[in-house]
Amino acid sequence: MATIQVKGQPVSTVRVEGNSRPLNGKSDVPLLLSFPHSGEHYPDDFDTNSELPFEILDFPNDKYVDELYQARSGLDLLSIHANFPRTYIDVNRHQHNIDVNMMKNGEEWYGRIHPSGVKTGTTLFWSKTKEVFDIYSRKLNHIELKQRLAQCFVPYHQLMTYYIEQIYQNHGKAYVLDCHSMTQFDGKLRGRKQRPEIDIGDRHGQSCTPEYTECVADVFSSFGYDVKINGRFLGGEIILRYGWPEINQNILQVEIRRDLY
């Protein structure tokens, strides 16, 4: 398993919790939970701007979201967790979503470059937090960024692929909840509009069947929450990569507003 150094000690970049029986072909429930942004282990080589307060750097992370789904253990569900913060590398971005301006000789990056989110600093390797605060005071080099891809991005998606395939082979179908949090209001660039309490993204029906979307939305609505489907967040790289309702492989991105907890 790939590791990062945290306070001089090796820490696995990704962990799997819950029922491991898919390894033996005996999974009971065709559901997997994904927590790509709840990591709290800051790598020693995360050389951030010394003037940036930690609470600002940590702000984009989906803190405590994995704790909201604690009932998963009683249901014996599998879950996959990134142990690193999303500002270090964001596994919910495409690997070619690169801002060349934050790198030395960025035009020489090894892969294709298809940036989105440059203005807000929210590409694969974040350059800003809260839209205005610079994460780095220097240009990054290719070696350190490619290392992050190899140690963090690749293992996360390898495990996602493996367990989804195991579930699918066992049941002929697979369901995934990609679990996130969001602030109460949009950022300044979007006019600070209030967001719904629960925002469920399915890329307008491209990542899962309507029945799955409606089922999850109805559960939240039954508890009195204001629920929107594709209201503010349609879903990122994870549901784009793994959502194939045409073969009954279904995934939703669920955003829970932070002020609720």
Residue ranges and their predicted role:
Residues 2-176, 181-260:
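N-terminal catalytic or cofactor-binding beta/alpha core of small enzyme domains
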